[in-house]
Amino acid sequence: QTWNNSYLLDINMIDKQHMHFFKIFDQLLVLNKNFENYLALAPLIDELEKYTKVHFKTEEALMVKANVQDIDLHIAQHEIFIEKIDAFKTAYSYQNTVLLEQMIIFMRKWFLMHISEVDRKYAEPVQKYLEKREIKEM
């Protein structure tokens, strides 16, 4: 399932980052289907790892500034996803294309659930925080 606008949180920088994740997942799935492209997966896996860490730091910083409740639970979910990326890298290092495809699909589903159920909970307080900040800067 690719990106659609029902995943938007109406937080511009976060929505753009979420869209970028879907592009990475789409590219990983396409390249993994053809073993000749297997080596091309390495830079995408690195990008996924780096981008995930940047994105999670962005989300977490916004949640702290907006005084979002239950932030510890949210951060714990982020840590679980980062552990999955480590498992993903291990599957890649063993050239296990079946496991790799299962990992890509799992991470994409996890990410989709995380956006639609978990991230959505912080959207309103972060939007209010950003609106107040914009008013102060005017």
List where the protein language model places each region.
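Small-residue-biased structural context
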Residues: 1-138
